[in-house]
Amino acid sequence: EETFAELYDAVDSGKSDFENINGLCLRDGSSFKYTNPRALISDLNTVPYPAYDLLELDIYFRYSTIPYSVDAYNSRRRLSTVWERGCPRGCTFCSHNGMSRIDLQNIYGSGDRKLGEKLVREVDKENDTFQAPARWPTAQYAVDNIKLLKEKYNIDFFMAVDENMTSNLKWTKDFCNLYLDSGLSETVKWGTLGDAPSVAVHPEIIKIMKNAGCTYISFGFESAS
């Protein structure tokens, strides 16, 4: 996100030299080269909420209905949110294995996966994101996001399209408790994504989420362990 913002500003100002922007892969004749690595964003509370006002929301709301649950099907003013960055799982087929911290380490860092050495980018050590492929803002940040969408756009449903909400039990419990306290759980229902093993190990999370207005979980059955 930070790389894209800097790249946009550079293009908008008419610049054509992007080598000072961290986190890019640039063409170099018939080959390519990397600019300096960019650390993962360690404090996601610093990320501003999306500029929903730049979207044609009347058109977006027209297609709110989705057949995932009764409330999702009946929704007329649905919007999507995303708070999590990354995923704690390491599924071999997933796109995260092509854009994760570990892959960037193989370009920039030190350590040999085959020898069992830790795969660490020095830049992550320096910026407090060491071994943190999955990160979340505070649960209050997420609840405040929904409050804003309700007040500004009168939404009746939201999709939390985080990679894997159920994988972080504490965060999900905190979010659900705060969401209940906010009074939004009756007027703004929601759904999200999760993995089956997390729920198999902690089945109580389903009831907590349901009580807080969650009407569906789109499960990934990557493993039954």
Predicted regions and their residues:
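Glycine-rich beta-alpha loop elements in corrinoid/cobalamin-binding modules
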Residues: E1-D43
